[in-house]
Regions:
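Internal, active-site/partner-interface "lid" segment
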Residues: 149-157
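Short, proline-centered helix/strand-breaking motifs
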Residues: 84-85, 110
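Glycine-rich nucleotide phosphate-binding loop and flanking beta-alpha elements
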Residues: 88-89, 120
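Short, glycine-/small-residue-rich phosphate/pyrophosphate-handling segment
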Residues: 107-149, 163-167
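N-terminal beta1-alpha1-beta2 submodule of the flavodoxin-like/Rossmannoid cofactor-binding fold
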Residues: 1-84, 90-97, 101, 156-187
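Short, histidine-centered active-site or binding-site loop motifs used for metal coordination
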Residues: 8-10, 115, 151
Length: 187
């Protein structure tokens, strides 16, 4: 069984990450994938204070209960989809904090990206590709899905209009699962 974490990377009260996550999960559920579980993680609901654990995350010797809880959740997963907005040409600080709070739990795991914003969060994703590669993850930018002109991309009922979606969710998931299986088998 492959377990994929779908992480909503924003925490603002007016954020649209949950809307994008629901859209993504609906698309994934239609794919009818066997032997795979997709786990939705919303960092707004996680207790992740900004780098408050007194020791370096590289050691994995966490003191805070919140860090231990986050570590366990991430450690149990085989790959990730980061859902990110773009704030001032980069990813939201809470997502970066969620990455930086722990370390070894991300190692040798693939990560795909779904971005939303004026330009589909391309600049935020570019930075996340670099960040995740530096901590030993396998970033999969080739199958990135971006939702551009986001304020126009959502209709009055809160649905995402497909004409604003760049990329293909099925290809993203297929690529992510290939890497998750390959890397899990090598651990």
């Amino acid at each position: 069984m492959i377990k994929i974490g779908v992480i909503i990377g924003t925490t603002r009260p007016t954020r649209k990450g949950p809307l994008v996550a629901n859209w993504l999960m609906e698309k994934i559920n239609k794919l009818d994938i066997k032997n795979t579980e997709f786990v939705l993680l919303d960092i707004q609901k996680e207790d992740l204070p900004f780098l408050m654990d007194p020791k370096s995350p590289a050691d994995g010797d966490y003191e805070l209960a919140s860090t231990k809880k986050w570590s366990k959740k991430i450690d149990e997963l085989d790959g990730f989809i980061f859902i990110t907005a773009e704030y001032n040409n980069g990813p939201a600080a809470p997502l970066k904090n969620a990455i930086d709070t722990i370390y070894r739990e991300w190692d040798r795991k693939p990560v795909a990206f779904v971005g939303y914003g004026t330009y589909g969060a391309t600049r935020a994703v570019e930075q996340l590709v670099d960040i995740t590669a530096k901590i030993g993850m396998a970033p999969l930018s080739k199958t990135f899905v971006g939702i551009s002109k986001f304020w126009d991309a959502v209709d009055e009922d809160g649905n995402i209009k497909e004409e604003y979606v760049n990329g293909n969710v099925e290809k993203l998931v297929d690529n992510l699962l290939w890497w998750a299986k390959a890397l899990k088998d090598k651990k």
